[in-house]
Design a protein with these regions (language model features):
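Short amphipathic alpha-helical elements of helix-turn-helix/winged-helix folds
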Residues: 24-28, 103, 176
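Short, hydrophobic secondary-structure boundary micro-motifs
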Residues: 38, 112-116, 163, 186
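Amphipathic alpha-helical packing segments from all-alpha helical-bundle domains
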Residues: 73-81, 113-116, 123-157, 168-172, ...
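C-terminal peripheral helix-coil segments that are non-catalytic and often amphipathic
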Residues: 1-5, 102, 141, 145, ...
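Hydrophobic alpha-helical connector segments
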Residues: 66, 80-112, 134, 166-173
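Helix-loop "lid/cap" segments that line or gate small-molecule binding pockets
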Residues: 98-105, 116-125, 212
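Helix-turn-helix
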Residues: 20, 24, 28-62, 66
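Generic hydrophobic, amphipathic alpha-helix propensity
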Residues: 14-25, 42, 67-71, 75, ...
């Protein structure tokens, strides 16, 4: 076997084990919560030694951040692709709303991990650094920036009122979807589901934000 081939296989195996560790971390967090999240618990999940984990992640903080980063990266790819397939501001805004609802609606545990656990993490399992913020910021540009570009293009063409704050509107629409899903997850966790079906609520959000793009909106 050639050296490049051996190196490629080594890198492939490294990536595979890294993914297995991230999946095991998710399992531990879902079962035990932030307070029960330790490297020892993850190691036991995989039948590895704690020392073996350090080969892939240098700390518990790094492991947790990379798990959240992976989820945001996947969400951004899905939603960003949906937005990029559109031509108008209204279509881009709708694509972002529907793709976000579709992505996290099928991954409610990932939604809770990404947006709720850091706030509830009294154990201090993860702190943010400038380097970590720099890695996360491109996700905002990929989604909010792409929606804003299409809204602004429509504004220049006179199709959308010029006073509409394009990027802020995209951000608020995104957080509205997340809020809807988090509320859905909250009531379902206590066996008291919402009266309104998710598709109907998503439709309402689309109509509300489309209205913001109309004259007088």
């Amino acid at each position: 076997m050639s050296r490049p081939r051996r190196q490629a296989l080594k890198e492939q195996r490294h990536d595979q084990v890294r993914e297995e560790i991230l999946e095991a971390t998710m399992s531990v967090l879902l079962r035990k919560g932030p307070g029960g999240f330790t490297l020892n618990a993850v190691a036991r999940e995989l039948q590895l030694t704690k020392a073996a984990l350090y080969y892939y992640f240098d700390s518990k903080e790094t492991l947790l951040f990379e798990l959240i980063y992976r989820g945001l990266d996947r969400q951004t790819q899905t939603v960003g692709d949906a937005v990029e397939a559109t031509d108008t501001g209204a279509d881009a805004l709708e694509a972002m709303i529907r793709a976000t609802a579709g992505y996290y609606g099928a991954r409610m545990d990932e939604l809770r991990l990404t947006y709720m656990m850091p706030q509830a993490d009294s154990a201090g399992s993860m702190s943010m650094t400038d380097e970590r913020f720099e890695r996360l910021r491109p996700f905002n540009d990929r989604i909010f920036g792409a929606v804003a570009e299409r809204i602004e293009a429509d504004q220049k063409a006179g199709r959308i009122p010029g006073h509409v704050p394009a990027r802020r509107l995209a951000f608020v629409a995104h957080t509205s979807v997340l809020g809807m899903l988090l509320m859905e997850g909250l009531v379902e966790s206590v066996d008291d589901p919402l009266l309104h079906a998710r598709p109907a609520m998503v439709d309402e959000l689309v109509r509300a934000f489309h209205a913001r793009l109309l004259p007088g909106g």
